[in-house]
Amino acid sequence: MILTLTLNPSVDISYPLTALKLDDVNRVQEVSKTAGGKGLNVTRVLAQVGEPVLASGFIGGELGQFIAKKLDHAGIKHAFYNIKGETRNCIAILHEGQQTEILEQGPEIDNQEAAGFIKHFEQLLEKVEAVAISGSLPKGLNQDYYAQIIERCQNKGVPVILDCSGATLQTVLENPYKPTVIKPNISELYQLLNQPLDESLESLKQAVSQPLFEGIEWIIVSLGAQGAFAKHNHTFYRVNIPKISVLNPVGSGDSTVAGITSAILNHENDHDLLKKANTLGMLNAQEAQTGYVNLNNYDDLFNQIEVLEV
């Protein structure tokens, strides 16, 4: 069983418009409302590829219940921790090939709720074999909250796949308890090191070999349409991917995380892990819906990916 954590989920609302009229009424004919958040995208893709998955995180109020009902409808198991605050909305206005987003900050977690979730998590940890943590921390949690979770996973021997950025990731990296996998994109990688971006192979090798990343088994760096670069222990890989028609790239990173987590759970070899992860990321990009993959195209893309030891 895989446990996914989305500590700051949202109800994602999409409003497609022919044109956005400012200071005027805009009428929308079709509205999409989904259970949102990076970890829930990971959850949906894991369920689609047939992995046993359990979703957790903080939810509150009617919007929190909406998320739970959406997962129920999709047949996805969940064990959320209920809080006093209200789960947030995140609104995307799609207009003239552009996307304007309005993102609520979300609820503030108090000390009692923060401690309560850790106890809740410890109980869930007894019955899972891998944990995928995605996205931002809600307001009120200490910056080292993910580090506390990772410490408990490490003590139980449960691998952790972590997808976050900025100060939250920096805090984890400076902590003695390390995740099994991190998945920064190339910009995030060099921001962590406070270095100018350099896409050359030698620079990437040097970057992921810095002391900041010591103790992390897998570092998988997204290079967008150029594929990926990875380090597994002391081995480096370059992943070349085919050109595809991209319909909606949002959620492709989360789908990649789902592939990594699935491969870790199933003890797949390095080449298959990297190919599965990138295949699912590309499949998501070919769909309008976020966190959705059409597995009919899986084998075709999988077989076109080239993984080279460098």
UniProtKB/Swiss-Prot annotation:
Broad class of enzyme this protein falls into: transferase
Chain coiled-coil ranges: none
Pfam families, alphabetized: PfkB (PF00294)
Catalytic reaction list: D-tagatofuranose 6-phosphate + ATP = D-tagatofuranose 1,6-bisphosphate + ADP + H(+)
GO molecular function: ATP binding; phosphofructokinase activity; tagatose-6-phosphate kinase activity
EC number(s) recorded for this UniProt protein: 2.7.1.144
GO CC annotation terms, alphabetical: cytosol
Biological pathway: Carbohydrate metabolism; D-tagatose 6-phosphate degradation; D-glyceraldehyde 3-phosphate and glycerone phosphate from D-tagatose 6-phosphate: step 1/2
Residue ranges of the TM segments: none
Gene3D superfamilies assigned to the protein according to its UniProt record, in alphabetical order: 3.40.1190.20
Biological processes per GO annotation: D-tagatose 6-phosphate catabolic process; lactose catabolic process via tagatose-6-phosphate
InterPro entries from the UniProt entry: Carboh/pur_kinase_PfkB_CS, LacC, PfkB_dom, Ribokinase-like, Tagatose/fructose_Pkinase
Record key words, sorted: ATP-binding, Kinase, Lactose metabolism, Nucleotide-binding, Transferase
Family: Belongs to the carbohydrate kinase PfkB family. LacC subfamily.
Protein name, entry field: Tagatose-6-phosphate kinase
Originating organism: Staphylococcus aureus (strain MRSA252)
Encoding gene, per UniProt annotation: lacC
